A protein has these predicted regions:
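Flexible, small-/acidic-enriched active-site or ligand-binding loops
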Residues: 136, 189-220
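Short glycine/proline-enriched turns and hinge-like loops at secondary-structure junctions
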Residues: 64, 133-135, 159-164, 177-180, ...
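Helix-loop "lid/cap" segments that line or gate small-molecule binding pockets
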Residues: 92-100
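Short Ser/Thr-interspersed hydrophobic loop/turn segments at strand-loop and sheet-helix junctions
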Residues: 49, 73-77, 170, 186-191, ...
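A short, Trp-centered hydrophobic/proline-enriched beta-strand micro-motif
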Residues: 117-125
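A short core secondary-structure module
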Residues: 147, 151-195
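Short Gly/Pro-enriched turn/cap motifs at secondary-structure boundaries
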Residues: 87, 114, 129-132, 156-159, ...
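Alpha-helical interface subdomain recognition
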Residues: 1-89, 101-106, 113, 117-118, ...
């Protein structure tokens, strides 16, 4: 496979793989128990350039292309899916909106620090009553005396505790429907930006997920991101890259579970021979490997289109849909191959299963992906 990638892509993949193998994988189980990703790990991601993967080098980033991003995301997710969640959200929907719609001043103010990991980004779109129905927002932003004043609540905000800057979507014109939503850059130390208690989750526990409340949170007028009324456009335009990132994350989780299952099947002896010599287990492993490789092809195809600046709404959704559902199947089979031991935390495949499940939900549920794909047919 190496011959299919450029030297830069291989270099980025190998750096991410080394970090995942040496730092993430040995500690992921403990971070899962602690429900906390150490700040030092985030700083190391920044030093490696993994937090500025879509930011051009002239703006302080390490952008090569989206295939390199997908390769790095797969490796980080194989080491620790929770770390990959933080990295994906920060890159795709943290840096992405500023890169695509920010003014030169906004880009200069935020992107270099974000790419270096000095400032982490969050994306505040989902609300308690508005998940897949993203346009049904209740958070309001009113222009008063040269400042935008935000009031409302957001739900399931990844990096909610860690972020220094949040991309916030709020209604600025209640009578304009979908065209009445705008996007804002809100520093998280702004008075009235209130971070709630982190959610207790099934998986990706080391990634902080918090509710956020805006209580007369006032920001300068120039913190409007893009044009007034462009909020939904900004949100949706960055979901393509976000879905490629999550698809690559699902791919990495599946690969980690598969590697453990393959190794265990070679070591565990039943009925006088290793599990891997039993036809039933061989067939499971063959199906798992095939599904993983098929998902990788879909992910990299979407990544190539994104790199070329070509439309990839359907392709990104196909990659995310297939990879996320594949990951749950592969992780389930990995548990089955381990038998009763697979149900124990000591063997870690149960954590991969828990982590995989969210990839069918965030950045658009599987049901939404099918709707998107069907509309493009």
């Amino acid at each position: 496979m190496d011959e299919l990638y450029t030297e830069d892509q291989r270099m980025i993949r190998d750096a991410a793989r080394a970090f995942a193998t040496e730092v993430l994988a040995p500690n992921a189980a403990q971070w899962d128990r602690d429900a906390h990703l150490p700040d030092a790990v985030v700083a190391q991601l920044g030093e490696l350039g993994l937090l500025g993967m879509i930011v051009p080098q002239e703006l302080g980033g390490a952008y090569t292309d989206y295939v390199a991003y997908a390769l790095a995301m797969e490796e980080i997710a194989a080491g620790d899916a929770a770390c990959a969640t933080m990295m994906s959200v920060h890159n795709s929907v943290g840096c992405g909106p500023i890169l695509g719609f920010g003014t030169p001043t906004q880009k200069e103010r935020w992107l270099a620090d974000m790419a270096a990991g000095r400032t982490i980004g969050a994306f505040c779109l989902t609300e308690p009553q508005a998940g897949s129905e993203a346009h049904n927002l209740r958070t309001r932003a009113e222009l008063r005396d040269g400042k935008w004043v935000l009031n409302g609540a957001k739900q399931f905000v990844t990096n909610g505790q860690r972020a220094g800057i949040a991309i916030v979507f709020a209604v600025t014109d209640p009578d304009a429907g979908k065209r009445g939503i705008s996007a804002f850059l809100v520093p998280t130390d702004t008075p009235g930006f209130v971070v709630g208690k982190p959610e207790k989750k099934m998986g990706i526990r080391a990634s902080d997920t918090c509710p956020i409340t805006f209580e007369n949170c006032a920001i300068p007028e120039e913190n409007l991101l893009g044009a007034r009324g462009e909020g939904l456009k900004i949100a949706l335009s960055n979901l393509e890259g976000g879905r490629i990132g999550i698809a690559a994350q699902a791919l990495g989780i599946a690969r980690a579970a598969f590697d453990k299952a393959r190794r265990y099947a070679g070591e565990r002896v039943q009925f006088g021979k290793p599990l891997a010599e039993h036809q039933a287990i061989q067939q499971k492993l063959a199906d798992m490997a095939t599904q993983i490789n098929a998902a990788r092809l879909l992910v990299h195809h979407a990544a190539k289109l994104r790199t070329a600046g070509l439309p990839c709404l359907s392709e990104a959704s196909q990659a995310k849909l297939f990879a996320s559902e594949m990951a749950e199947r592969v992780c389930s089979d990995a548990i089955q191959i381990h038998g009763g031991y697979g149900y124990l935390a000591d063997y870690e495949v149960e954590r991969h299963y828990r982590d995989a499940r969210i990839t069918q939900i965030y950045e658009g549920t599987s049901e939404v992906q099918r709707m998107v794909i069907a509309r493009q047919l």
